[in-house]
């Protein structure tokens, strides 16, 4: 793992507005680390409901490491695992409330350079101690390409994270390369990832995050994470956003509440009565 930590960190101001320096850092690097924008109560509520959600769901059907296929619930012989649950806002109101978090949306507005922000999807990944699976370096772009590449993710940490417990690692500036070869498709894999010899995780930049910290990053940024071999869990949840007026360039699976306006307006949303059931 690269020892160079190329991070600009800051605490969100009262209005959540980024400085010119912070905006430029994002443009140059494709990501930015925001120090905990949540209140102690907000973070505790998220943490409590996150743990309860994973406790009450069938673990055998929440495997989310990149093994097997969805048809078999990703069953494999690997001793390593990541448990995952999508569409968090459909499980508990606290996750729906998170989508409208003003300080987070303020920062997103500055990063995305739009006042019109919609939801794409949400998910949570739990890497257990000592056996948390790694994720190869990849671009989210290949899962849901959009015309104007407005898509960004907010990666929310519920635990302190570092390479030791499988924390996020990035290649700063890689978003400027645009869409890279999807080696996963070339290898006939069910998953999408870039050439690991060109983007080895050992040369990536680790994001050293604390509980409550948020990393906002472009879906073109090359990122991944090592295995969690530590005695600590790594809990995270992620919200994916897009400009309300950006559009997908390829067919994609339906996501509950995709297109939900979180801030601003969607001027292009069809209001035709006959199409009222169309996502």
Regions found by a protein language model. Give the residues of each.
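Short hydrophobic-aromatic micro-motifs
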Residues: 33-34, 154-156, 215-217
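Conserved double-stranded beta-helix
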Residues: 14, 176-279
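Short, solvent-exposed loop/turn segments at secondary-structure junctions
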Residues: 39-40, 124-127, 142, 161, ...
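A structural signal for short, well-ordered beta-strand segments
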Residues: 122-124, 154-156, 237-241
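Non-heme Fe(II)-dependent double-stranded beta-helix
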Residues: 3-28, 35-137, 143, 183, ...
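Residues that flank catalytic or metal-binding motifs in active/ligand-binding sites
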Residues: 91, 120, 150, 164-166, ...
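Catalytic core of non-heme Fe(II) oxygenases with the double-stranded beta-helix
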Residues: 106-109, 132-207, 246-253
